[in-house]
């Protein structure tokens, strides 16, 4: 069965094990998620659990949103997401960080930091040309392709807006769970800026 929770990225820090091993960790604050809806094949065509995270003021919500969360007897939520393959939850129940424990392997999804308009070297990792005085080719994108099509094909690696994409990092290890503070410590870095939404789910591809 899949386990999942929504949280907010706080930042990175470091901890030391009893053996003195240094571990860099990302701090995720995951206040209790509220189950807003349980979808079934009969009514919705598929099975999923819809959860809400991070309360917001009622004045910022419209009537349909208020009516939706009222069924769960909770405040309007800033983020609403769905998890599949989760069983045993009812509308109004809470999902807390203690569903995970140290040593669990998870997949973490977030929105990568936006970098703005960038060239092909930074955006796609291409190599630059000679930087000598006589060279005319420094940081340009290179060949646009053969002559015959008389056009540039789609998906050609060119300069453009970089970042701001949905990114998932698989098979990260949970180092520590602190239920009294609603905090999860995950080994390594996770995508996204501070205060951004983070989704933590059970790993799809477990290490063999």
UniProtKB/Swiss-Prot annotation:
Q: Name one GO molecular function term.
A: rRNA binding
Q: Name one GO cellular component term.
A: cytosolic large ribosomal subunit
Record's Gene3D superfamilies?
Answer: 3.30.160.810, Translation factors
The record, for InterPro entries, names: Ribosomal_uL3 (IPR000597), Ribosomal_uL3_bac/org-type (IPR019927), Ribosomal_uL3_CS (IPR019926), Transl_B-barrel_sf (IPR009000)
Membrane-spanning regions, if any? none
User: Which GO biological-process labels does this protein carry?
Assistant: translation
Give the UniProt keywords, A-Z: Ribonucleoprotein, Ribosomal protein, RNA-binding, rRNA-binding
User: Which intervals of the chain are annotated as region Disordered?
Assistant: 124-146
Q: What the protein does?
A: One of the primary rRNA binding proteins, it binds directly near the 3'-end of the 23S rRNA, where it nucleates assembly of the 50S subunit.
Q: How does it assemble?
A: Part of the 50S ribosomal subunit. Forms a cluster with proteins L14 and L19.
Q: Which family does it belong to?
A: Belongs to the universal ribosomal protein uL3 family.
Name of protein: Large ribosomal subunit protein uL3
Lineage of the native species?
Bacteria, Bacillati, Bacillota, Bacilli, Lactobacillales
